[in-house]
Regions:
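Low-complexity, Ser/Thr/Pro/Gly-enriched N-terminal "stalk/linker" regions
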Residues: 6-8, 15-69, 80, 85-115, ...
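Positively charged n-region of N-terminal signal peptides that target proteins for export
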Residues: 1-5
Length: 149
C-alpha cells in the first residue's frame, strides 16, 4: 500500500514540476515577444526628426505622413510598454512632435502633416481629428501617472 501511495506522490510532484516549468517558460517568452514586437514597431514606423518623432502612416520614409490618430496610438503604445527608459524617451519624442504640430491657437494636433512636402495643405493644418486628440490626451494622462514628470 505504501508503495502505491509513494508512486502517486511522485507522479503528483512530477506533474506539478512540469506545469510550473511550462508556465515559467510561457511567461518569459511572452514578455520577450512583447519587447520584440515593440522593437520591430519602432524600427518600421517611428521616424525621428529635429522636431521629435512621429508615427509614419505612409509607405515612404522620405515623405512620411503623420496623422494625429497614429501619433496618439504611438504615444499609448510607448506608455503601455514596459521598457522603462526606452519607452519613456520614445514617448517624449512623440510628445515633442505633437507640440510642434498643433493647430494654431489650440492644444489639438493637426490631423495630417506630410513631412518633406514643400507646402502643406491649409485644410490639413487648420483642422484636427477628435479621435487622435482623445488618444493623445489619454496617453498624456497615463504618462503622468506612470512617470510623474
Amino acid at each position: 500500500m505504501t508503495k502505491r501511495i509513494l508512486s502517486f506522490v511522485w507522479f503528483f510532484v512530477v506533474i506539478l514540476l512540469f506545469v510550473f516549468s511550462v508556465q515559467y517558460v510561457k511567461n518569459e517568452s511572452s514578455e520577450h515577444n512583447k519587447q520584440e514586437i515593440y522593437s520591430r514597431w519602432q524600427n518600421k514606423y517611428i521616424i525621428n526628426t529635429f522636431q521629435g518623432s512621429y508615427v509614419n502612416t505612409s509607405s515612404h520614409n522620405k515623405r512620411g505622413v503623420a496623422l494625429s490618430e497614429a501619433q496618439g496610438y504611438g504615444m499609448l503604445i510607448s506608455v503601455l510598454n514596459n521598457q522603462d527608459k526606452t519607452s519613456e524617451n520614445q514617448f517624449y519624442d512623440l510628445y515633442t512632435y505633437y507640440k510642434h504640430h498643433r493647430v494654431k491657437g489650440t492644444y489639438l494636433m493637426s490631423w495630417c502633416y506630410t513631412n518633406g512636402a514643400k507646402k502643406q495643405k491649409q485644410a490639413d493644418l487648420k483642422n484636427n481629428a477628435t479621435d487622435g486628440d482623445l488618444y493623445i490626451a489619454y496617453a498624456l494622462i497615463l504618462a503622468s501617472e506612470k512617470w510623474s514628470q
